[in-house]
Structure formats: structure tokens, C-alpha cells
Amino acid sequence: MAKAENVEEYVAQQRAYIASNPECGTSHYNLAVALMGQKRYEEAEKEFLEAVECSPSLAEAYVQLGGLCLQRGDLDGCLEFNKRAVHSRAGFSEGWGNIGFVHLQKGNIDEAIHALEKAVRYNPKFLQAHATLANAYLMNGMIEESIDTNRKVIDMEPNFAVSHNNLAIAYMENGEFQLAVEHCDKAVALGYEVAPEIRKELEAYR
């Protein structure tokens, strides 16, 4: 197989593969990814749909379709495609993470926690899913669970600013104000915009 020299050549190459084998889901998927890189989203969506029509177990294509739905504000569409992703491949952590994220956006916190717990069970190193799960715990009043999960994130990535911010809030809720100050300052140092009311409340504990 000849190596493509640039994106346009790669697109042409994938179109040629599809012309010779229209039922190849992988070629449709590869073409779609290249089109995404060129911000040709409508064409990419068509190719992702062709990909899953040819290869219904192509979980990554469902995730990409969900991402396109999210891009235009269609949370229900994003949720549906990610559900198809996890049904097409058992233990697909990325799909479960996206399902959890959408449920959180829709205010379905229990459903978000259920999905995100699956995401981190299937992939214990899924940093963003851990961080989103910690936020869901916090929103649900599960302070200790939020603290434990945010600390896992910090163990994996010490400079993950969102988790330092969330730890500041969780420790405040728990009455552990010195720890709250420590993580608030770390979040600020990392460039995170901590809510002014949080910073103001913590001033008394400096």
C-alpha cells in the first residue's frame, strides 16, 4: 500500500479503496477521520454512517457520530450513538464515559454516576472519566467519594487543575479548610479560574 504524502492524497486513496470495495467499513471510517481533520463535518458524518452500516461493531465510529451530535448541541443524538457504541463492544470505556458526560449535562446524575463507574472500571487509567465521575459525586452530595476519586486523578496527573478545583470545593463542604486552601491555590497556579465566591470564602482560613 502506497503511503499518502498529505491529507488530500490520503482522502483520494481512501475513496479509491471504497470504490473498489464499497462494503469496507474501515475505509469509510478512515476517510471520515481524514475529512474531520479538514473540518468537512457533513461529509465525515456520511462516511461514519456508511462505516457502521458496513461494520456494525465499529464502536469508534459510533463515538465519532456522537461527537458530531454534541458539536451541534444534540445531546439525545450523542447519547444514542454512544449507547450503540457500548452495545457493539463490551467494556468500551470511551462510550461509557461519553454516556456519563451526557447524562451529567442533562442533569441525570444517578445515570451519569452509573455510566462513569463503568467507564473507570473498564479502564482504570481513563483520567477524564475519573474527573467527571468525581464531579458527579460532588453534585450528588457524595463528598468522600468525590474526594477519593479526585485524589486518584491527582495521583495520575498532579497538574490536573479541574480536580484541584473540585477538591477545594469538596474539602470546603467537608469542613477541611486548610486542604481546601491548598487545592484552591494549586488550581489557580495552574491557570484554572476558581469561582470568586470560593476564593472569598477561603480567605478567612489563610
Report residues per predicted region.
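Helix-start (N-cap) detector for alpha-helical repeat units in TPR-like alpha-solenoids
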Residues: 25-26, 59-60, 93-94, 127-128, ...
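Structural signature of tandem alpha-helical TPR/SEL1-like repeats
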Residues: 2-16, 38-50, 71-84, 105-118, ...
